[in-house]
Amino acid sequence: MPSIYVQDVTLRDGMHAIRHQYGLDAITSIARALDRAKVAAIEIGHGDGLSGSSFNYGIGRHQDVEWIAAVADVLEHAKCTTLLLPGIGTVHDLKAAAALGVASVRVATHCTEADVAKQHIEAARALDLDVAGFLMMAHMNSPEGLAKQAQMMEAYGAHCVYVTDSAGALTMDGVRERVRALRQALKPETQVGIHVHHNLSLGVANAVVGVEEGAYRVDASLAGMGAGAGNTPIEVFAAVADRLGWQHGCNLFALMDAADDLVRPLQDRPVRVDRETLSIGYAGVYSSFLRHAENASKTYGVDVRDILVELGRRRMVGGQEDMIVDVALDLLASQQRA
């Protein structure tokens, strides 16, 4: 009977769904509800991690330190966690977060670039933080290649390494193969995590498959609040885990209430599988491109699906949000020539 560490990402990945505009009252209410529901950890910060607030990624309503301080102040059970992308967030940012009460950090890189995480993982360990490696866009690397990247993060000091399906593009077999490869390649004491998106409507199924293959840490969010069609809906996953007899420690009804009463009313765009978010999973595109691509579509009169599919064809990855407008302009020029 598996025991699972459930990490909620409503207040970090969920930032993408509302353009990083959570108010302090909202995050405090959500964090308090999650804490009372006994989730193991709550991640807080700009959707693109510490110092992600920028023209390229989206300006946050508040600074990370304000969000973190507000959440850390109300937690009694859950760990306060955050995300850092090397090249965006710095060791200085990490130290500031730790001083405010962050106890755990995920250091995220593209699935072929684990080497850029070395400095930040080592710094996190020096701060006595729990630290996980976060291999994003996992569908763009083979299971064997991903396992080698995970071993690098393990060598730098990561306590856990995640298979991160940022595009929501993996099928269940794809998740199974990658989690199995990591579990076989890493030391027994190094944990494996699973983070998926719901773009192909496989958010819960893929999380379940991940656990079946040895993942211990599972990311999920209230009402699936996250980039694209969202993440694994935490209340649905908890219900499925209960049906399977898994130990996750969360209060199912409390999660249901928080999802419906606190999170859904904040969505200015429904977090769901629709023609745009389905196109993200179909094309294998970074889920947080959604709102940027919709803006470009509205500005230039190009079908957002065409933009997303072309981004996938060009193999654009997180950090290349500036290319979305370029793609829209190229498609517009092609239409005008036709």
Curated annotation (Swiss-Prot):
Coiled coil: none annotated. The active site is at residue 16. It is an enzyme of class 4 (lyase). The keyword Transport does not apply. The keyword Manganese applies. One of its GO terms (biological process) is catabolic process. Keywords: Aromatic hydrocarbons catabolism, Lyase, Manganese, Metal-binding. It catalyses: (S)-4-hydroxy-2-oxopentanoate = acetaldehyde + pyruvate. PROSITE patterns: PYR_CT. Residues 4-256 form the Pyruvate carboxyltransferase domain. Substrate binds at residues 12-13, 166, 195, 286. Its EC number is 4.1.3.39. InterPro entries: 2-IPM_HCS-like, 4OH_2_O-val_aldolase, Aldolase_TIM, DmpG_comm, DRE_TIM_HOA, PYR_CT. It comes from the Bacteria. GO terms for molecular function: 2-isopropylmalate synthase activity; 4-hydroxy-2-oxovalerate aldolase activity; manganese ion binding. The record marks 12 as: Transition state stabilizer. Mn(2+) binds at residues 13, 195, 197. It holds the Pfam family DmpG_comm. Belongs to the 4-hydroxy-2-oxovalerate aldolase family. This is 4-hydroxy-2-oxovalerate aldolase. It comes from Rhizobium rhizogenes (strain K84 / ATCC BAA-868).
